[in-house]
Design a protein with these regions (language model features):
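Flavin-dependent oxidoreductase catalytic cores
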Residues: 1-144
């Protein structure tokens, strides 16, 4: 299976799950045969403000590659700028979160709330894809 220029060993993909897909869990899933591991979502604004906890969430172990980093936010300019800022990190794919229904995310117009604004979705995806060379995917939620 291929996603852009990234070839996966198989089509078993670990979904990004906040509070679950930390490094030990990802390594366990890799040992069990996952072809792509997805990290917990990170906030574009937290990257912008150099949040130390967010830096820790973006740590990648060589044994887990390939890995996808999931970014969330609702400002297309900040999303694209932060995607570019972190592009040198060793993740293979950037995933945009448009599926998280948690009130503190969706309540800010981020995550699944973006599905209510197709024009903003288009702008975010377009700007992020243009900003980086790595493949970009989008996690969505069916309905809202």
């Amino acid at each position: 299976m291929r996603i852009g220029n990234v070839t996966l060993e198989n089509n078993v993909i670990l979904a990004p799950m906040a509070g679950v897909t930390d490094l030990p869990f990802r390594l366990l899933c890799k040992e069990q045969g996952a072809g792509l591991l997805c990290m917990e979502m990170v906030s574009a604004k937290a990257i912008y403000y150099n949040n130390k906890n967010t830096e820790a969430l973006m740590e990648i172990d060589e044994r887990e590659r390939p890995v996808s980093l999931q970014l969330f936010g609702s400002d297309a300019d900040i999303m694209s700028e932060m995607a570019k800022r972190i592009e040198e990190k060793p993740f293979a794919i950037l995933d945009i979160n448009m599926g998280c229904p948690v009130p503190k995310v969706a309540g800010n117009g981020e995550g699944s709330a973006l599905m209510k604004n197709p024009e903003l979705v288009r702008e975010i995806v377009s700007k992020v894809v243009k900003a980086i060379e790595k493949p970009v995917t989008v996690k969505i939620r069916k309905g809202f």
